[in-house]
Amino acid sequence: MKRLSDSWKRGRPDIVHFALMEALSTPLFMNMMLRVYVHTINDKIIAIADNLRIPKSYFRFERLMVSLFRDNLIKSNEGAILMELSDGTFADLVDIIKPDMVIGLSSVGVQSNAQKVAENAQSADHSSLVVGGFAKGHFSENVTTSLGPTYSISNIALEAHVVIARILYECEKLLEKGIDHEGDKKSRQIGA
């Protein structure tokens, strides 16, 4: 593994598991106000269904991922698609989502805080928040070219699931208050 390029960004599905557990257990996701995608270093896109409940056991999650990468699809017992794997670059994923704004979250971003980043995300009708799921390092150039503003929400490097928890909580608070920069009360959807 260490001989592969960008080896520090490989081999840590536990980070993705923690991040997904955090995002998929939020009221935003449960109320279908959050869409979640995973983009891999090997240019694979994982689309997550609105009703997915991720296994809490890492070992069950690992088996699920093996099945997904083998079959390109995970279905429920009723036949509903829960996860779908396809080929695509990060730019392809942005084209699929079609957000008005793509916000990166990185320890090397412009210093801010979770509340201000959430307010910025809420200022657009359809925002995407991008959090790196690797042990160390930063976004590749292929990713940064598709990002809009990139922020750091702490003066120390935070783990991906902590960043997700803080940002999504701030988004929930704004939605509960009905804050809308244009004065209307329309529901917003955030992609992560």
Task: Annotate the PLM regions.
Residues 49-56, 117-119, 142-143:
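Short, aromatic/basic amphipathic alpha-helical patches
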Residues 102, 129, 150-152:
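Short, well-ordered beta-strand core segments
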Residues 57, 89, 113, 139-140, ...:
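Helix N-cap and loop-to-helix transition residues
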Residues 1-109, 172-180, 191:
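RNA substrate-binding interface of SAM-dependent RNA methyltransferases
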Residues 135-192:
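Structured adenosyl-cofactor binding patch, chiefly the S-adenosyl-L-methionine
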Residues 95-96, 123, 143:
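Structural alpha-helical scaffold elements that stabilize or flank donor/cofactor-binding regions
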